């Protein structure tokens, strides 16, 4: 029995002339021709003083707004006039001509005539109208056009459009362009019209794509001078986010300190004094305004010097610089007399100092970051190892240690301008292998080994202004082979095979716990880089050197595992300096 074809199937070889996209396109073309000639139209849209005869059915098919409007209305004998007004008086394209032009583009799209956008202002006006009328496809077409036209010159204007219509991808792209081309963006008129909060947010961004901080300072001052009487009150607020210590010293003297607006602003004086102190005494490790922005030619790098191999038998000759952002290692000249061990290392005025050690215990070497070479400087009066160094008020302090017979009370201070060491007040209790850190203008010596080899929990505090020591609240541990760094007025202590990172607040004399480490180490390298505490290498609980690296972020309280060191090492030097990435 012969079976018939299903109703929806057509005979083989036959084409349905009333189906398919071509037919739909012909219908739309006919409707668009009727619209332009006013044929069979049943509604009039009015915008900017112009009338646009249209078909309700076509508008309802292409616009959620008109579909809802016409479905709720009652049939009328003649064509109704529907005013199409902007969303808000300040919306793009709100002039009469702009409103009419935007509606013409929307109607072309609804009737299938295509869309040809020529400028960002036009696209923004059409986007606003398409958003209001619920023409989804046209909205996406406008967004694609704006993304394709995004440049430094219009990034601020398009960011406002993105914010107005909640266009997250466009806003993100605008933000990228703003950061990458900030110096160019700041030269355009749109930048001068930003609100104070917007300027502050830009200046505070650590990812600004500027080669030098001078560009940030000049942008801030250009914005203020655009309307100085009204904006001079924002100077302090803006200058807080300019990293003045990163300016060239000559530029700072000629352009910043000599600026009339800044000279008249008493609120700005502490910031200028802070920058001047950094130029003279050296930067404070971890201070935000002394850290290069992420995409500068300059960057903070971690310098790792020498140390002992896995079994502690060999003294490593290497010195390397590590850039955490790119995870790139760069070899540096080896420290002369590398066979020394248990030396102390510290950074002062962006140079690296290494003092003492088990062999040549009086020697002090300086690695000049400018000359990229090691230079021998004045020797210690008292040879020592298992000591520590720290910087307070631009001077280097060598504290305690061991001379082969006894733990040392001795403290020496180094003046880099005269290249001389002088005795400072001795420690109340002699210690070696203690943690030493400077914070709030004072020196703190935490824990360590006393005479007889017994560990202590004492915290000894030195005030360089009075050349006097005092005792603070004892640490919640008694350990040696400790390390400490300070960051934002807090001291972080670790090492000593302790499983935790401890905190000490010199202002309140209170101890606390910050985080738990994945594995305990001692004699590790600890430094602050990019606002985080980096813990590199050290000896594990089996007495072997490790290549593990951890970072602790005080802002989140999280400890993260980082890529390993190039080799296992312990009892090494570890400091942070600023270096050109092109070197």
Curated annotation (Swiss-Prot):
Kelch repeats: 301-350, 352-394, 395-441, 443-489, 490-531, 533-579
GO molecular function, one term: ubiquitin-like ligase-substrate adaptor activity
Domain annotation BACK: ranges: 146-248
Species for this entry: Homo sapiens (Human)
Gene Ontology BP, a term: proteasome-mediated ubiquitin-dependent protein catabolic process
Protein name: Kelch-like protein 35
Keywords, alphabetical: Kelch repeat, Repeat
Pfam short name (any one): Kelch_1
SMART domains for this protein: BACK, BTB, Kelch
Residue ranges of every copy of the BTB domain listed in the record: 41-119
Gene Ontology cellular component annotations, sorted alphabetically: Cul3-RING ubiquitin ligase complex; cytoplasm
Keyword Repeat: yes
Xref: CDD domains: BTB_POZ_KLHL35 (cd18265)
